Amino acid sequence: MSVRLLDDIINIKGDGTGVAGLRSSFKFIMITVLGVALGWFFAVKLGFDTVHLPFIGDIALGWLMIPVFAFSVVATGNAVNISDGLDGLAGGLLMASFGAFGIIALLQGQFMLAGFCFTVIGAILAYLWFNIYPARFFMGDVGSFALGTSLGVVAMMTNAFFLLPIIGILFVVEAGSSAIQIFSKKVFKRKVFISAPIHHHLEAQGWPETKVTMRFWVIATVAAFVGVLVALAGGHILL
């Protein structure tokens, strides 16, 4: 979070060199180091060394839990950051995802974790009052990455790492479309999308900003509902 806060401050005030913000490589390294440190604490100090695969069971990872945890945190943080491109978009998607994991945590008996998820939802609701179109306030890198990394941590604490791509399917699509666009431009020297990530592609095709946002909210809500159903049927929750 501190890395993104510094980046936002530099972006706003400028440093006199004409370079906006911190270098992407520096931010990625620092965030990865943070993810590995959190993964080590999660695996070594808290003793978490398994992940649950829906309908299969627990998979023992041992020390591999550290890179898996780091990937969950770093990938989710960056995916949410990429999704924060339209008024109200990231906030709505995050509400759906935190809602799903909050329900899963509640049914698992992790009441403090569930309380955290629902508190985040309350905070996002207050934020969305001012962020829906036309937005007056924006979360910036510090907000999107803090919430994204928190979502990744919650997924690990509910032992639902493999549910994260289902519940957060639109984060996967957003980040994936950007990755595909970058790869295609560098390797094939052409673009797959008119603009990336996908929400800008839809805008370029003539969709109004509010239409993209509301339809993504609908998809995110359905994905969250499906994720909870998979958690119930797949063995994440023992009733």
Q: Where are each of the predicted segments found?
A:
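Juxtamembrane boundary at the C-terminal end of a transmembrane helix
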Residues: 46-48, 226-239
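Final/C-terminal transmembrane alpha-helix of multipass membrane proteins
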Residues: 211-231
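Transmembrane helix segments
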Residues: 170-180
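Cytosolic, membrane-interface loops and tails of multi-pass inner-membrane proteins
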Residues: 6-20, 179-210
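Short beta-alpha connecting loops at secondary-structure transitions
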Residues: 164, 183-187, 235-239
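C-terminal domain-closing interface element
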Residues: 138-142, 154, 200-214
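"…together with the soluble PPM/PP2C metallo-phosphatase catalytic core" -> "…together
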Residues: 1-138, 142-172
